[in-house]
Amino acid sequence: MSLVSNSIALIERGANEILKFDELERRLRSGRPLRIKAGFDPTSPDLHLGHTVLLNKMRQFQDLGHQVVFLIGDFTGMIGDPTGKNVTRKPLSREDVLANASTYEDQVFKVLDRTLTEVRFNSEWFEKMSAVDMIKLAAQHTVARMLERDDFAKRFASQQPIVIHEFLYPLIQGYDSIALRADVELGGTDQKFNLLMGRALQEHHGQPPQIVLTMPLLEGLDGVAKMSKSLGNYIGIKEPPIDIVTKTMKIGDDLMWRWIELLSFKISAAEAVALREAVAKSELNPREVKLRLAHELVSRFYDNAAAEKAIAGWQAVVTGQGNNNLLPLQKINVPADGVRLVALLTKSGLAPSNSEAMRKLKERAVRVDGIVVDDAHLHFVPGFEGLIQIGKRNFIKVRLVTSSESQEFPESNRIDKS
């Protein structure tokens, strides 16, 4: 295969659609570094694996020698992206946007090569725009064209309000491509309309229209809905290593292959096919593949040592292999006179309610430091430190404290083998 053919094979991996493919091939053959753009509105301070689908593709372009522009939409974030919404999104304040954006650089450079990345803010050009300039921009598209967007069309048909500023969002995102002279813009499949807007506006302004590359939306831990912090089905890239491992081990086998395609750098497309065949023939336990993926993710966001330690901690409890001293110790604040076991099970997040905790105790599914217990009144005082389990699937290593500095253990950190 030629160099260009190899590049295209890497670029195509996991991609949903490339428009126009022949233009991409022609620009790659030119031999010049392309400008690859992807925009992120800072609506939240933390990024999750769903965001890294685009970051990973950007990194692949960097590995091929191209220049990446990581665009922080501090201006567009104050408008609110209407994509996929059946109601108007609440705009963020300037303070919220800047606070969220301040956390992005440290996170994105866990994936991107800093030396081949421009970090830009779209307020650079929009804050210089006059009202006349904005009206001229708005004049470049029709309301009828905007209503071709699926979400706008549905809201219009159901008589849900569409606010005028929402029509401006695709135009403003498209104008970013003019300001940055983008060769390629990346986005989720839900962003296709906005990405094509950039292409149309570039052509209108005499620039070569950008190639549009859409990536699938990553399904979350449930394997159904797209990964979202609001749905709780996400893995944040700043989460502790043990949490990344345990959440990755929870995903279904079918979802595992999807994640490998979109998230893995180390498992090639060809190897993924071979692994899938081995699993189908029962020659390989899918758990081993998930462990490999989990190791890669933790290594990317932390380092190899953190990955080894987290996996050893997970194996110590779930498979009985290794040393459970490697598990992180979670502080749980309790009253000075202590807490009963039922309350501790709910307080730790192992059980959703006292009644469910009682049911598990009656089933003799609860263990403390490996010993089965069924006494709901068993009392624990501050200073207790140990491993509490419900079955083999859910467990937490705790230290009971009364300090005001302690933090209750969040549910997302529970280990669940299911």
UniProtKB/Swiss-Prot annotation:
EC number: 6.1.1.1
Record-level GO BP terms: tyrosyl-tRNA aminoacylation
Annotated localization: Cytoplasm
Protein name per the record: Tyrosine--tRNA ligase
GO cellular component assignments: cytosol
Residue ranges that the Swiss-Prot or TrEMBL entry lists as coiled coil: none
CDD domains named in the record: S4, TyrRS_core
Motif ('KMSKS' region): 226-230
Annotated transmembrane regions: none
Motif ('HIGH' region): 42-51
Keyword Aminoacyl-tRNA synthetase tagged: yes
Family from the record: Belongs to the class-I aminoacyl-tRNA synthetase family. TyrS type 2 subfamily.
Natural source organism: Xylella fastidiosa (strain Temecula1 / ATCC 700964)
Keywords carried by this UniProt record: Aminoacyl-tRNA synthetase, ATP-binding, Cytoplasm, Ligase, Nucleotide-binding, Protein biosynthesis, RNA-binding
Self-association state and partner proteins as the record states: Homodimer.
Residues given in the record as ATP binding sites: K229
Pfam families: tRNA-synt_1b (PF00579)
